[in-house]
Amino acid sequence: MNAQDNLAYDISVCTHSDAIAVEEATIWGSQPVGLRPLRRLADGSLRSGIVTLPEGWSSGAPLSAATHQQFAVLSGRLQFGEATLGANAFAVVPAGGAMPAMAALEDTTMILIQNEGQSYQPLNGEHHQRPAPVILPDAYAVEPFTPVIDGVPLHGFERRVLWIDPATGADTRLLRIPAGFSGAGANWHPVQEEIFCLAGDIQPDATRPMRAGSYLWNPARSIHGFDERTQGGCVLLEWHDGQWDLVRV
């Protein structure tokens, strides 16, 4: 068997967040939140979603997360323990880590990313014994670099790596793509790739135009990117479930 065997063809899922119905969900504590699921795992559990916290919402007591939890604040203000997080903040609670009490100081919207098997349990004075959250008050303050694919620097691109899972190599990144970029054609990745458009425009092909608020899931070993291009440039939040690579077809 070679690397090209057992590839899927054109099964990417692209949608706009406005088209996803809001569900009421209880994720942290007892107060419900608004949830627009982006992707669910095979067992029905949430992998990623857009969470809306109304002003005054609170998680109550600190919690322990069973698996890694990441979130990126899109708008609003969130009290996260002693930190106040606004738009463009990013945080990770490692598996088994102590997640401080949260409170929405304003209506707050975030992208939530969870690993498989996520659950939350109350903490009983064990904060100092558990991994602490990783907090980036401004994700854009992370030093950008020019990505290199197949030995070719992508000049005009900016990649900011926000977090890497030390066990799997899975990363979460901000990617700025310059205006007028056109991709090199069909490709696939060995891992799941999820993309949320934060600003601008992009399309993986002509049938899937994306704008701010659009979401794209490229399943692992799925051929996609047939006519990738952007007119005005864009900023994307990307996350994966393993070490990312790009394989040309």
Provide a role label for each language-model segment.
Residues V33-G34, W57-L63, P153-W163, G169-T172, ...:
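Catalytic core of non-heme Fe(II) oxygenases with the double-stranded beta-helix
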Residues G49-I50, S59-A65, E82-A83, M102-A103, ...:
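Short histidine-centered beta-strand/loop micro-motifs
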Residues S64-F80, A179, G185-D205, R211-A212:
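Glycine- and acidic-residue-biased ligand/ion/polar-headgroup-sensing regions
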Residues M1-D43, Q118-T168:
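A short, N-terminal "cap"/entry segment at the start of jelly-roll beta-barrel domains
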Residues R36-A83, G200:
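The feature marks the first
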Residues Q70, V92, L105-P122, L216-W217, ...:
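A short hydrophobic beta-strand segment most commonly corresponding to one strand
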Residues F80-M99, P204-G225:
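Short acidic-glycine-tyrosine-enriched beta hairpin
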